[in-house]
Amino acid sequence: MSEDDPRPLHIRRQGLDPADELLAAGALTRVTIGSGADAETHWMATAHAVVRQVMGDHQQFSTRRRWDPRDEIGGKGIFRPRELVGNLMDYDPPEHTRLRRKLTPGFTLRKMQRMAPYIEQIVNDRLDEMERAGSPADLIAFVADKVPGAVLCELVGVPRDDRDMFMKLCHGHLDASLSQKRRAALGDKFSRYLLAMIARERKEPGEGMIGAVVAEYGDDATDEELRGFCVQVMLAGDDNISGMIGLGVLAMLRHPEQIDAFRGDEQSAQRAVDELIRYLTVPYSPTPRIAREDLTLAGQEIKKGDSVICSLPAANRDPALAPDVDRLDVTREPIPHVAFGHGVHHCLGAALARLELRTVFTELWRRFPALRLADPAQDTEFRLTTPAYGLTELMVAW
């Protein structure tokens, strides 16, 4: 990308890397997002230490959003304030602590252990479909776009007969290529489905996340909170994992000498997954942080109410982390990264994400040891309208 790219600086990418102008922006700099009446000025942090400081200090920085009447349906936004009740990223301690505690029954070690066989099954089902389709095939269509949604539906507790419809609603109301009106309509339908599902779970709690929270907290977990929990889980676990699968396979096929890491023991595979997560960093940035008071950050004077955007891809390529931080090396000791956030808002589903990715990559190369790009000369098309970075297509052969 170039400086002529109209997209906000913090989401610009070039191939598998953050854009050069993003990496060159400096530890903390002023950026303008939008134009005309919609233009907003923010601070943007790119240095790893600064990003950790901002995300880790809830005393000086808040995630509470500043709402605008235009955020109502029909304006520039999709989610209304009432629809973000239960979204942990929109709360600070102690309210955040109270809500996160309610959500933890859905992410216990026992729950993750129960999910493992299902994840392996769904991955192999999708690989079966790809194999039946024959070589070459689009790995995005058969695997990357299918596995995350199936895993999330199982986690949340969506009935199997409803899952295709549920994922269409989930994807549709986030699709920036659709009109605001269409996205809003899909969002309302998605919301109504969630409330109906929550009502069923209250009568007869299932084994999914909603059932686990209802069984533990009953009416102390409100319908609005449960809906917000579901929305956040789907936002965090769908496009992010889909993007990681597609980009991860592309990265490994460009570095075939490193694929053996997924043919060894579980520890080697997990180390490889963590390096891919750092190197690719598909989420652009977490919720902007709002300064609670005047303060100095990275030598800059930040005023109370100023917004700070943290660029996660840039932070994870900070040369301060390692002299060869721009090189993919899945055998190296893990480099500390912020792809899952930091502080009280560190991703609750990080263990599930790692398990899912490890299963996909391990099973893929176990079953398709000769996997390769169908046409190495073909240009790669990246997704630019989804909440996380990814690929629109990845044609592979075997």
UniProtKB/Swiss-Prot annotation:
Pathway note: Antibiotic biosynthesis; vancomycin biosynthesis
GO molecular function, one term: heme binding
Residues annotated for heme binding in this entry: 347
Gene3D superfamilies xref list: Cytochrome P450
One GO BP: vancomycin biosynthetic process
EC number(s) from the headed UniProt entry: 1.14.-.-
Any Pfam family the entry gives: p450
CC cofactor: heme
UniProt keyword annotations, A-Z: Heme, Iron, Metal-binding, Monooxygenase, Oxidoreductase
CDD domains to which the protein is assigned, alphabetical: CYP105-like
Family: Belongs to the cytochrome P450 family.
Role description: Involved in the coupling of aromatic side chains of the heptapeptide of vancomycin.
Protein name: Cytochrome P450 165B3
Native source species: Amycolatopsis orientalis (Nocardia orientalis)
Gene giving rise to this polypeptide: cyp165B3
